[in-house]
């Protein structure tokens, strides 16, 4: 079957850096044990499972602060999504060793909020409710940051039209953000705009927008919790007009989606392991609706192939 490998796709530099830092921590026997990740280092269950094999425990909970309250000793790794200053303070009070894997793009947004909130600015922050990145950003200045996910959320805000900054979560759909920002500027014409869609998110979305129309269907390989993966499927359907399905790995691919297709596009989120995506691509390339021997969708990627290799520090 004809497969269009939509590029760029897969890991971004922030994800790779975060995973390398966590793997180096696992190899560093001088670090206090246990080793914990507050949440998922990146939003991919395969990565979480692989780190468990490395001896790193990924903790889950309603938010980072509640998770941390249950940690009494050891080392904590802050995920690529960033954490609030309150989380950092509590970790320090508990005497925990901290490793910060926050993506530099997220750190830049935190710095903006911190600096401008001190000057009295209010923030309209476009992001996804319940996602850890907005949680961390809002925690920088809780009284100054107003989370907006939809146009309805925006309309319900009542802010003075002065000293306002409009910014956003780094992994949102750039088209959704643009629409909400446009309306926000109509409501608050004196506001400053700081568009923080990260470059990796932007170029992956643009690639889908430009290339998906060549395909009958698009498969996005990514975790259900991965906002950037879900947005890629959204871009395919809403911008390119091509039906799209998000799958965690090959085992979630349904053959009825592709059996009538002449060309299938495949892309993947910024936190999706390359071997997981390659397995999907190889399967679809070899798939023949008339040959049952090509229908096996069992995932076969070994867990030791999931994480990037790192050099052992001497």
Swiss-Prot record:
Entry cofactors: [4Fe-4S] cluster
Organism superkingdom: Bacteria
Gene3D superfamilies associated with the record: 3.40.50.11270, 4-hydroxy-3-methylbut-2-enyl diphosphate reductase, catalytic domain
Cofactor note: Binds 1 [4Fe-4S] cluster per subunit.
One biological process term in Gene Ontology: terpenoid biosynthetic process
Alphabetically ordered keywords of this record: 4Fe-4S, Iron, Iron-sulfur, Isoprene biosynthesis, Metal-binding, Oxidoreductase
Binding annotation for isopentenyl diphosphate: 43, 81, 131, 226, 228, 271
Binding-site residues for (2E)-4-hydroxy-3-methylbut-2-enyl diphosphate, renumbered to this chain: 43, 81, 131, 170, 226, 228, 271
Residues the record lists as binding [4Fe-4S] cluster: 12, 103, 198
Binding site for dimethylallyl diphosphate: 43, 81, 131, 226, 228, 271
Active site: 133 (proton donor)
EC numbers for this chain: 1.17.7.4
Gene Ontology terms, MF aspect: 4 iron, 4 sulfur cluster binding; 4-hydroxy-3-methylbut-2-enyl diphosphate reductase activity; metal ion binding
Enzymatic reactions: isopentenyl diphosphate + 2 oxidized [2Fe-2S]-[ferredoxin] + H2O = (2E)-4-hydroxy-3-methylbut-2-enyl diphosphate + 2 reduced [2Fe-2S]-[ferredoxin] + 2 H(+); dimethylallyl diphosphate + 2 oxidized [2Fe-2S]-[ferredoxin] + H2O = (2E)-4-hydroxy-3-methylbut-2-enyl diphosphate + 2 reduced [2Fe-2S]-[ferredoxin] + 2 H(+)
Biological pathway: Isoprenoid biosynthesis; dimethylallyl diphosphate biosynthesis; dimethylallyl diphosphate from (2E)-4-hydroxy-3-methylbutenyl diphosphate: step 1/1; Isoprenoid biosynthesis; isopentenyl diphosphate biosynthesis via DXP pathway; isopentenyl diphosphate from 1-deoxy-D-xylulose 5-phosphate: step 6/6
Family statement drawn from the similarity comment of this UniProt entry: Belongs to the IspH family.
Functional note: Catalyzes the conversion of 1-hydroxy-2-methyl-2-(E)-butenyl 4-diphosphate (HMBPP) into a mixture of isopentenyl diphosphate (IPP) and dimethylallyl diphosphate (DMAPP). Acts in the terminal step of the DOXP/MEP pathway for isoprenoid precursor biosynthesis.
UniProt-recorded name of the protein: 4-hydroxy-3-methylbut-2-enyl diphosphate reductase
Organism taxonomic ancestry: Bacteria, Bacillati, Bacillota, Bacilli, Bacillales
């Amino acid at each position: 079957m004809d497969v269009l490998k939509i590029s760029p796709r897969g890991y971004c530099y922030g994800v790779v850096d975060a995973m390398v830092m966590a793997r180096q921590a696992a190899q560093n026997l001088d670090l206090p044990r246990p080793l914990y990740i507050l949440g998922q280092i990146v939003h991919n269950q395969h990565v979480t499972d692989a780190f468990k094999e490395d001896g790193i425990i990924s903790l889950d909970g309603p938010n980072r602060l509640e998770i941390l309250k249950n940690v009494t000793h050891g080392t904590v790794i802050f995920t690529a999504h960033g954490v609030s200053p309150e989380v950092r303070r509590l970790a320090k009070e508990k005497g925990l060793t901290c490793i910060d894997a926050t993506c530099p793009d997220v750190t830049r947004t935190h710095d903006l909020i911190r600096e401008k909130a001190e000057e009295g600015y209010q923030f309209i922050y476009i992001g996804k409710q319940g996602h850890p990145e907005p949680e961390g950003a809002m925690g920088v200045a809780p009284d100054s940051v107003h989370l907006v996910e939809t146009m309805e959320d925006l309309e319900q805000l009542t802010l003075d039209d002065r000293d306002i900054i409009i910014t956003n979560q780094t992994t949102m759909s750039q088209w959704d953000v643009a629409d909400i920002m446009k309306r926000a500027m109509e409501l608050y014409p004196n506001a400053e705009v700081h568009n923080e869609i990260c470059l990796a998110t932007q170029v992956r979305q643009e690639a889908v927008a430009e290339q998906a129309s060549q395909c009958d269907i698009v498969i996005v390989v990514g975790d259900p919790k991965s906002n950037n993966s879900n947005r890629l499927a959204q871009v395919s359907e809403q911008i390119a007009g091509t039906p799209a399905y998000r799958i965690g790995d090959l085992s979630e691919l349904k053959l009825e989606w592709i059996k009538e297709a002449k060309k299938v596009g495949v892309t993947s989120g910024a936190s999706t392991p390359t071997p997981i995506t390659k397995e999907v691509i190889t399967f679809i390339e070899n798939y023949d609706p008339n040959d049952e021997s090509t229908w096996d969708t069992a995932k076969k990627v070994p867990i030791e192939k999931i994480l990037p290799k790192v050099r052992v520090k001497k």
